[in-house]
């Protein structure tokens, strides 16, 4: 899980979703998991 100021989709499997006001990226590739904070 990377914590970043700006989250971007890295590959085509990445999905940007918002959970409880937190922007997250979920992906089948574990390295691509990110959240904004």
Swiss-Prot record:
Pfam (any one): Ribosomal_L36
GO terms under biological process: translation
Classification via SUPFAM superfamilies: Ribosomal protein L36 (SSF57840)
UniProt cross-references to InterPro entries, sorted A to Z: Ribosomal_bL36, Ribosomal_bL36_sp
Cross-referenced PROSITE patterns: RIBOSOMAL_L36
Keywords: Ribonucleoprotein, Ribosomal protein
Domain of life: Bacteria
GO cellular component, one term: ribonucleoprotein complex
GO MF entry, a single one: structural constituent of ribosome
Family: Belongs to the bacterial ribosomal protein bL36 family.
Name recorded for this polypeptide: Large ribosomal subunit protein bL36B
Organism: Aeromonas salmonicida (strain A449)
């Amino acid at each position: 899980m990377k914590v970043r100021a700006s989250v971007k989709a890295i590959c085509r499997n990445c999905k940007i979703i918002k959970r409880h006001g937190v922007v997250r990226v979920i992906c089948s590739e574990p390295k691509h998991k990110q959240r904004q904070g």
